[in-house]
């Protein structure tokens, strides 16, 4: 913030400030737990590894832990992540259904210029061969 002549604002962590708040705020005080809390990941990938160290490392190796930027952060950190915030990450949903502006009409040529040239050459010259 020194760029804007703002000083003495303390340590700023822009990534942490943009992160989603996963805990719900309550006014009641909870009693102190007597045991350690269970190890459950905050990003929702618990069902993949189920607290198994070997399953977790296998999931990391096979890239099974699906965490998209819009699941972790409230707003995109970079311009490259901006597109993933629009994208639906449901496995059964196609992007064309959620964002109709992606779809473009296709005008295919059944007979291209090269195909027409070949057909014309074959009809006019019996000895014509491409090779």
Swiss-Prot record:
Secretion signal: which residues? none
The UniProt regions of compositional bias labelled Basic and acidic residues, in chain numbering, are 21-33
Specify the protein name: Sperm microtubule inner protein 11
Q: Under the cellular component aspect of Gene Ontology, which terms does the record hold?
A: axonemal A tubule inner sheath; sperm flagellum
Q: What InterPro entries does the entry give?
A: SPMIP11
* Keywords (A to Z) from UniProt: Cell projection, Cilium, Cytoplasm, Cytoskeleton, Flagellum
The entry's localization annotation reads: Cytoplasm, Cytoskeleton, Flagellum axoneme
């Amino acid at each position: 913030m020194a760029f804007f002549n703002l000083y003495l604002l303390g340590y700023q962590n822009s990534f942490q400030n943009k992160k989603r708040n996963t805990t719900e705020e309550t006014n009641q005080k909870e009693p102190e737990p007597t045991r350690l809390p269970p190890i459950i990941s905050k990003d929702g990938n618990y069902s993949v590894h189920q607290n198994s160290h070997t399953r977790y490392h296998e999931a990391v190796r096979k890239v099974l832990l699906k965490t998209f930027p819009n699941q972790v952060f409230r707003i995109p950190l970079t311009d490259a992540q901006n597109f993933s915030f629009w994208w639906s990450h449901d496995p059964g949903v196609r992007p064309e259904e959620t964002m109709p502006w992606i779809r473009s009409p296709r005008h295919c040529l059944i007979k291209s210029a090269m195909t027409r040239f070949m057909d014309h050459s074959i009809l006019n010259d019996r000895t014509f061969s491409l090779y």
